[in-house]
Structure formats: structure tokens, C-alpha cells
């Protein structure tokens, strides 16, 4: 089967990526084990439930699954759930770790029938490793080279049927041949405040922390639609409630704790405000190219595109246009500025008013 406290606050408390191995272990403890326990992503859950039921009925390996979407939405959790629901073992790795064809071959040849191989950041597979993967996905076979130079020969090895679950935050970087070999492709979306409140309530129970519904909803509203962030904020608010109160997480206690953490009522932290203020003040509201924006705020281009922008765009504070990034009317209002005359209204907030 699947092999698999209080922490110092990470530098960016609303980062959607794990801050440390300790935090990853903490996440595993809170992770739902079965599909029925998984909150949100109703469409994806419904599809996987049917596909897994059919595969179990036929006693076959589940078709290969590609999960994509912003970080922290539950791709790794779903991979573990798939293995558990199918009653098989899970082997986990990531694209950057598989540097040589032999690394992948060693994993594949050790899989038992119908096992799940989970490759995180699959878009970062090297081309030479990806080539080895194609026949493994299609025919459950791999070709490996024995020997060197003129004496080298190719040997075909048969594999047990298996399921590859690939996860990526950048589906557009997958090559077409690799993408086409996944029979099940699912996009994970940001969660609603109500869904996140259910996750926060469940996590609080596992942590044996007292929380009322309004306290859970206040944390959920500021979690940027992301369960990983919601659970991290819950732990920090729990710490605050134990020191400053009687340990019960109320709306007022959550509001005070999150204000201390510099997380505002729409889930923005210092980095979000820094990006939007750069667009507004340094570039006159845009358009501004992502490379110029990265230089202005001292961040990597990938950080802006993968971590900061998705939520700002989803919330209607930033637009991505062919000419560059542009601040919306909602961004001007958020900072108490008058928007330029003739600017279209914002798209509204994902989670409503706090």
C-alpha cells in the first residue's frame, strides 16, 4: 500500500508550495485518504470515481492520469487517493530527479501489476527520459541499451501494467506526444470559500483545535482558493488563539492573527501588493512585460507566472494581454486610487466580500 507540532512560519505564509519537509509531513497527516473525504473539485472527483470503479471491475490498471493546475490544489493528494482506492502501491518521484533513462527504468521495472507511478513536475522531464516513457505508457515495454560503442545492443523489457499519474502546474510546457498518451486529463480549479471552510473545519478536528464556523470561513476567505494555504493559515491562527485567547478560533481571533501575518481581507500579502503597486505606480497601470515586472519587484519570472499571477488574474485584479500585464479597476480600488477614465469595471471577487 502507500508508503509514505507546531512549525515556524514560512517566509511567505500564503505561498502555495510547501515551505519545508516538516510542512510536507504535516500536510500528509491532514491529507484525505479516500475520494469520499476529498472536498471540492466535484467534476474531477466524479470522473475519477467512475473511471476507477470501471477499472476495478475489469481488474485492470487505471488509464494514465494527467493532473494540472496551480500549486497547492490537491494534485499529490489525488495521486495518493487513486492508489489507495485502486488497492495498489504508489511510487512517487519528480521530473527533475529523473536525470537519466536508467533512473526511470529502475522505477518502472520495480512496479507490481496495476501499481501507480506518480511523477510530480512532469513538465520538467528531460527529452531523453521522456523518450523512454513513450513505449512504457503505450505498450508496457521499455528499450534499454546494453554495452557501449559498436557492441551496444538494444534490449526490450516487458513491464507490468501500471498507471502513470503526472502532475504539473504548467500543462502548456508538456510536449504533444507526452500529453496525448494520457487517457484521463483533469484540471484542478481554485476552491470556493465554502469548500475551504469545510477543509479548515476538518483539519481543525484532526489538530484537536476548537474552531467556530465563522472562524473557519474567515480563514477560508483569505486562503487564495488553495487548501495548502488554508491549512497553513489554520496552524498559524491556532498558535495565535492559544497565546492570545482561550484556544478557540473565532472570526475575531482569525482576523487579528491574519492581520499580524500581513494577510489582508482578500488574501493578499506583501508580495501581491508589491506586484500590483509596481504595475500601478512604476508602470502607470500597464501594460508592462513580465520581465520588466520581475526586475522591478526582484522576483523570478517563473514565480510571477506560476505563484503570484494566477490568483490575481482569477480575482480580477490583473489582466494578461498580448502587450503585457495591466491593472484592472479592482486593483485601483483596492489601493484607494481613481481608475483611469473609460476603464472597464472589474470582474468581481471570487469569494465575495469578507
Curated annotation (Swiss-Prot):
GO terms for molecular function: ATP binding; ATP hydrolysis activity; four-way junction DNA binding; four-way junction helicase activity. GO terms for cellular component: cytoplasm; Holliday junction resolvase complex. It is an enzyme of class 3 (hydrolase). ATP binds at residues 30-31, 72, 75-77, 138-140, 181, 191, 228. Keywords: ATP-binding, Cytoplasm, DNA damage, DNA recombination, DNA repair, DNA-binding, Hydrolase, Nucleotide-binding. It is found in: Cytoplasm. Residues 192-262 are annotated as: Small ATPAse domain (RuvB-S). The keyword Ligase does not apply. It comes from the Bacteria. Residues 4-191 are annotated as: Large ATPase domain (RuvB-L). Mg(2+) binds at residue 76. One of its GO terms (biological process) is DNA recombination. DNA binds at residues 301, 320, 325. Its EC number is 3.6.4.-. The keyword S-adenosyl-L-methionine does not apply. Residues 265-354 are annotated as: Head domain (RuvB-H). The RuvA-RuvB-RuvC complex processes Holliday junction (HJ) DNA during genetic recombination and DNA repair, while the RuvA-RuvB complex plays an important role in the rescue of blocked DNA replication forks via replication fork reversal (RFR). RuvA specifically binds to HJ cruciform DNA, conferring on it an open structure. The RuvB hexamer acts as an ATP-dependent pump, pulling dsDNA into and through the RuvAB complex. RuvB forms 2 homohexamers on either side of HJ DNA bound by 1 or 2 RuvA tetramers; 4 subunits per hexamer contact DNA at a time. Belongs to the RuvB family. HAMAP family: DNA_HJ_migration_RuvB. This is Holliday junction branch migration complex subunit RuvB.
